[in-house]
Design a protein with these regions (language model features):
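PLD/PLD-like phosphodiesterase catalytic module centered on the HKD motif
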Residues: 1-216
Length: 216
């Protein structure tokens, strides 16, 4: 998409910020085709973790705050293996995805805090142009203890679980951290679903099945 929009329009970036009362970050998992590691860390991840320091002005303070916020939090990016590169932090994962006779073009971000889960589906890659300049389309799916599009959220989680089988990386450390985050997320979602009032029985049963699969 070649048309540009003003750099002041950062609605897609702002979707990475936690809403009021979201709680502590659990982790984030996102997919993209092209990828800018510096942009992801300094713009997307910084918003998700609510990092106040600026990397270009407060270098040491930024690094210390990032390490402190990332400590218990998982962050991973699934990137088409042709675009993955090697420029990334050791504190979060870049997972190259290899799809036979195809490319990894999905742009889906799963952002999880202790009291809130958000799915962001967009047409924009994780780059400066994809998030700040191009005309892109985006939508969000929210889950709290009071409201959620449970079926859509379940399908999104299922997609991310399925993509794990396409990752070119076979290193057990990455797979273990990836699956650990999905299990933790499933625990959080299932607790919210079972505690929510007025949800249809089939929704509760659906998330119980998702939760059981994630623990396998």
């Amino acid at each position: 998409m070649s048309k540009k929009k003003r750099q002041t329009d950062h609605a897609l970036l702002e979707s990475w910020r936690p809403p009021r009362g979201a709680g502590d970050p659990l982790g984030c998992l996102t997919t993209t085709f092209t990828f800018d590691a510096g942009f992801f860390e300094e713009e997307c991840l910084a918003r998700f973790l609510e990092i106040d320091s600026l990397p270009d002005r407060e270098g040491l303070a930024y690094l210390l705050e990032r390490e402190n916020r990332l400590g218990p939090t998982y962050a991973g990016v699934l990137v088409d293996h042709r675009q993955a590169g090697v420029d990334h932090s050791l504190r979060w994962d870049v997972l190259p995805v290899r799809i036979p006779r195809a490319k990894q073009h999905a742009k889906l971000s799963l952002l999880a805090w202790t009291n809130h889960v958000r799915i962001v589906i967009s047409s924009g890659n994780l780059t400066q142009h994809g998030y700040r300049y191009n005309h892109e389309v985006a939508g969000t799916i929210e889950l709290t203890s009071k409201e959620a599009a449970h079926t859509l959220l379940g399908e999104s989680c299922g997609f991310l679980e399925y993509r794990e089988t396409d990752t070119a990386l076979s290193r057990r450390k990455f797979n273990r951290h990836y699956k650990q985050f999905l299990r933790q997320l499933s625990d959080s979602i299932n607790t919210k679903v079972q505690a929510a009032r007025g949800l249809p029985r089939d929704v509760r049963q659906f998330w119980s099945r998702v939760h059981r699969r994630s623990q396998q």
